[in-house]
């Protein structure tokens, strides 16, 4: 039981909610990245068609294909971090739920029953789960599996850092 008396969310429910949220994020990412990818891809095909008998000039390929693709990937990465912030902090702040948590009938609540869920708490969750997970190898796995042995609140590392727990709000 959570400090507020609600039942704690189990690993399976949290994993399914995470997978639903990941599907939403992947749909957004594909909508952002595919047009850029096709633009660079067709540009690359055009470069190859214009190449002489010795093949394309490596410097030209580098500057007209690979650098724009790298810049596009960096841009998409930054947009995804912004999307994850909006989705997991701003959107979840209203009810303590993302779309995946709503579907699975889960809610993020503060460990302190008298505290309100704040942008700061959700921002800390985001920092550990997404920003930290980008830079520290295997942190995302360790973070998610942490709840399997955490007692008494079954918290993931991002929950511990933010002072939150995830509870079941429906049958």
Where is each model-derived feature located?
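Intrinsically disordered, low-complexity Pro/Gly-rich regions
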Residues: 1-4
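Juxtamembrane cytosolic face of transmembrane helices
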Residues: 6, 10, 16-17, 22, ...
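Membrane-helix interface segments in multi-pass membrane proteins
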Residues: 30-80
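Membrane-interfacial segments
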Residues: 36-48, 94-95, 99, 103, ...
């Amino acid at each position: 039981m959570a400090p507020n008396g609600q039942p704690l969310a189990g690993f399976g429910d949290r994993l399914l909610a995470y997978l639903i949220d990941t599907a939403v994020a992947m749909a957004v990412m594909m909508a952002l990245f595919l047009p850029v990818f096709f633009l660079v891809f067709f540009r690359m095909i055009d470069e190859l068609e214009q190449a002489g008998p010795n093949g394309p000039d490596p410097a030209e390929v580098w500057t007209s294909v690979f650098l724009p693709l790298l810049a596009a990937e960096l841009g998409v990465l930054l947009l995804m971090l912004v999307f994850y912030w909006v989705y997991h902090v701003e959107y979840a702040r209203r009810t303590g739920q993302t779309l995946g948590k709503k579907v699975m009938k889960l809610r993020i609540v503060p460990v302190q029953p008298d505290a309100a869920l704040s942008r700061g708490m959700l921002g800390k969750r985001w920092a550990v789960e997404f920003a930290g997970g980008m830079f520290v190898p295997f942190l995302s796995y360790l973070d998610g599996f942490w709840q399997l042995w955490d007692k008494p609140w079954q918290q993931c590392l991002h929950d511990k850092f933010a002072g939150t727990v995830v509870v079941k709000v429906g049958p």
